[in-house]
């Protein structure tokens, strides 16, 4: 992504703005709380990955704190999803996502310990974390779409565009961090025919325009 270093800071600012947009809508649409929690879960997992890739290259304490904040925020969102009595998703669907998140947290903990103990990452463990993170977030996205369809709640199109843009940008940040700081970037980015970062940037711009319309 040839201009990623120029885009990353504006994208981060946009993520914060879009998150506030979604949270504001949450207060107005009580039936949308379950979706908002799933949204928060996806965002914070990507932010934790983004911070971890940077931490793996520097062992910087501030970056480690960002990882912890991301994981804790995702954990809070997951607890809300698990504790919800909305009935939007089945217990089995929620438990599947929760188990996947438990595996993700375990791998994140192991990877952090490797960096702290040895001063550099274990590439095999990093690849496992990347694969688990991608699988987990794919599942979360599938469940989010299913929850939208089955909840019977009318969602605001602008909020949905904002959420989609925020998740996409958080994913882009994590992918770019993987490319910049580790040799497992291809594992995280997936197959060669996956949408490129440049294409994702165009998709983000389109979603952002829809959110602002």
Indicate where each model-derived feature is located.
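Extended amphipathic alpha-helical interaction segments
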Residues: 118-213
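N-terminal extracytoplasmic segments of bacterial inner-membrane proteins
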Residues: 33-62, 69-72, 104-109, 154-185
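Heptad-repeat alpha-helical coiled-coil/4-helix-bundle sensor or tether segments in soluble regions
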Residues: 65-128, 132-135, 139-142, 198-213
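Short, charged/polar, low-complexity loop and linker segments
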Residues: 28-29, 50-54, 145-149
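Sec/Tat signal peptide C-region and signal peptidase I cleavage site
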Residues: 23-27
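Bacterial N-terminal signal peptides that target proteins for export
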Residues: 2-12
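Bacterial N-terminal signal peptides
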Residues: 13-21
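Charge-dense, low-complexity intrinsically disordered segments
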Residues: 35, 61, 91, 123, ...
């Amino acid at each position: 992504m040839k201009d990623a270093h120029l885009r990353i800071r504006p994208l981060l600012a946009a993520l914060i703005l879009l998150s506030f947009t979604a949270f504001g809508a949450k207060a107005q649409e009580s039936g949308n709380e379950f979706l908002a929690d799933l949204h928060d879960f996806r965002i914070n997992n990507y932010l934790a990955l983004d911070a971890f890739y940077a931490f793996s290259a520097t062992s910087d304490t501030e970056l480690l704190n960002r990882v912890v904040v991301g994981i804790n925020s995702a954990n809070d969102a997951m607890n809300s999803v698990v504790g919800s009595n909305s009935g939007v998703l089945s217990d089995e669907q929620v438990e599947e996502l929760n188990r996947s998140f438990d595996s993700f947290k375990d791998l994140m903990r192991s990877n952090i310990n490797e960096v702290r103990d040895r001063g550099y990452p274990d590439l095999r463990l990093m690849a496992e974390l990347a694969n688990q993170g991608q699988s987990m977030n794919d599942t979360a996205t599938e469940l989010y779409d299913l929850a939208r369809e089955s909840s019977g709640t009318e969602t605001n199109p602008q909020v949905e565009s904002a959420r989609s843009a925020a998740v996409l940008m958080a994913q882009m940040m994590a992918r770019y961090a993987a490319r910049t700081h580790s040799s497992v970037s291809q594992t995280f980015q997936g197959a060669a025919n996956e949408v490129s970062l440049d294409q994702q940037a165009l998709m983000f711009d389109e979603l952002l325009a829809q959110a602002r319309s």
